[in-house]
Amino acid sequence: MNFKSLLLCTFIGLSSLAQAETVHVATAGSLKTLVDTTGRVIDNLTLTGTVNRSDLRYLRNHVKQLNLKDVTIAEETVGKVLYPDNVMPDSVFIGDKVLANVVLPASIAEIGKCAFKEVRGAAFTVDFSNCKHLQLIRANAFSESSLQEANLAGLTALQLIDAYAFYWTDIKSISLEGCSSLIMLGERAFCNDYFVTSVNLKGCTSLQTVGNRAFLNLAKQSGDAGTLDFSETAIESFDASSLQSTKIKTVIFPATLKTLGDKVLNLSKVTNMKFLGSVPPKVGAQWMMASALKHVKITVPAGAVAAYAAAFKLSGEDAKNLTDTNGATLGIDGVTTPAISAQKRYNMSGQRVGRDYKGLVIVNGKKVVK
């Protein structure tokens, strides 16, 4: 390395260091006296101490990477509006065109309405990993932002993802793994998230309701979000259009399911459905296109084929893809019959025999007396 190159590398290194700042805020509301944002964008800012809504709002459009992990948010009243403590304030970063990464405070219990709506920093990411007390993500919290992923894994206190919370973002993946207190996904919570390729719902054992259009148009651009596995949830109801127009291959419905609302899977690309409940759900109007339903592979619990066929109004040729976990299908006159035509039968001399053969036979490698 020549001398000029060495000087250049040193200059770049010093410039980068100069842009990384750590500031302790001893008194909420005093950030303006500690950080000058006039005509500048800070590459990397870490705050500690106590801040309020005014402090955070002051940073809007002035910071690329913001670490708030060790910050406590204090209550503040602005005009007639009260911004509570331990809540990421409503609309605090709305429309920020610079913010690209934020590490959320470990102490917050709630993310307010529109807090990060329309944040469009390059490849916007949010670190939720420290938010062990987070209970609520309010309406439009991240809607229409350039957010890259919704990784809420391990947030065991989270109870509600409100309406439009992650509406029309750039997220590629959704992980709610281990969100054991999550009860509800609100209306259009993940609607129009076109680029999603995976959804993880493992451990969402308290989830009861998926709201109207919650996953509408999921993966419209990516083309395949894989499997939506609700098997570990306690969902009783999927509201109208909640999975409409989704680009997913497989849906696994829980044993607790009671209702599938109007147009739940209308215009979706589902090719496999598995129902874990022995009693079929009540289905709303056009819950799935009739032309699509008869081509979808449907698996139900043992002995439940007839009940599901009746509930879904499937019969004859249209019911050929409906089977139970034992391989039973809907036979003639609505009688369920095991799918045994493929069984190979041999007598003790090794000769292939038919189903009517009497005596000791070997069926698929096992001895059976007929």
State each model region's role:
Residues 14-20:
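Sec/Tat signal peptide C-region and signal peptidase I cleavage site
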Residues 20-26, 43-51, 63-86, 97-110, ...:
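Structural signature of tandem-repeat unit edges
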Residues 90-92, 112-115, 138-141, 162-165, ...:
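Consensus positions within tandem repeat domains that build extended binding/scaffold surfaces
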Residues 2-3, 360-370:
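C-terminal tail/sorting-segment detector
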Residues 326-349:
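Residue-level detector of functionally pivotal "anchor" positions at catalytic/ligand-binding pockets or at interdomain
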Residues 5-14:
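Sec-dependent N-terminal signal peptides
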